[in-house]
Swiss-Prot record:
It comes from the Eukaryota. GO terms for biological process: chemotaxis. It comes from Xenopus tropicalis (Western clawed frog). Residues 36-138 form the SCP domain. It is found in: Membrane; Secreted. Its main location: membrane. Belongs to the CRISP family. This is Allurin.
Length: 204
């Protein structure tokens, strides 16, 4: 049977695993590194190119929150408080959710979010009424911390729940059309650049 999937996102439009076994095991180091590398690869591929795109790194705090959110097995976003981390700074994080009927592959989840760029025009926003918030969160320049979790929820129609948290959150309503500053790669990095991404540690 074909795998059905459904995706949701939240990032303050201002406006291994599983859920029912009594625990919330974290993703292993190999998976963490893969997810960071995949996000950075996609962030390097934005079009137009980005002057200020930060390199992502793993956040244990964001990962714990994402895992706890997945393990709740509910089809709704976690609250701002549940998406908050204190280290290295006090951030509220954005949240992307991907649910499937079969155990997902993380590449499919992350690429499904990023592929919303096909319905997005930089400086204009979504084409018609298309969903683009997953893409803009993945491509949000000032987001640099990532944490993800996965849970199996056998009582759900879509039993596999994959969640990533992004800190600090993106998708601020006043800049949703420009999730990063367009221009020559790394032209606006405050200090260093590594393979098209800014590597300076942000401040609060």
């Amino acid at each position: 049977m074909d795998t059905f999937n459904f995706i949701i996102c939240i990032s303050a439009l201002f406006h291994s695993t599983y859920g029912d076994d009594g625990g919330t095991p974290m993703l292993d180091t190999e998976t963490q590194n893969y997810l960071v590398d995949l996000h950075n690869l996609l962030r390097r591929s934005v079009d137009p190119t980005a002057k200020d795109m930060l390199k992502m790194e793993w956040s244990p705090g964001a990962a714990l929150n994402a895992q706890n959110a997945a393990a709740k097995c509910v089809m709704q976003h976690s609250s701002a408080t549940e998406r908050q981390i204190q280290d290295p700074f006090n951030y509220v994080c954005g949240e992307n959710i991907y649910v499937t009927t079969a155990k997902p592959d993380w590449a499919a989840a992350v690429n499904s979010w990023f592929n919303e760029r096909n319905d997005f025009t930089y400086g204009v926003g979504p084409n018609s009424d298309k969903m683009i918030g997953h893409y803009t969160q993945v491509a949000w320049a000032k987001t640099y911390l990532l944490g993800c979790g996965l849970a199996f929820c056998p009582g759900n129609y879509y039993p596999y729940v994959s969640i990533c948290h992004y800190c600090p959150m993106g998708n601020m309503i006043n800049s949703i059309k420009t999730p990063y500053e367009a221009g020559e790669w790394c032209a606006s990095c405050p200090e260093s650049c590594e393979d098209k991404l800014c590597t300076s540690n942000p401040t609060a």
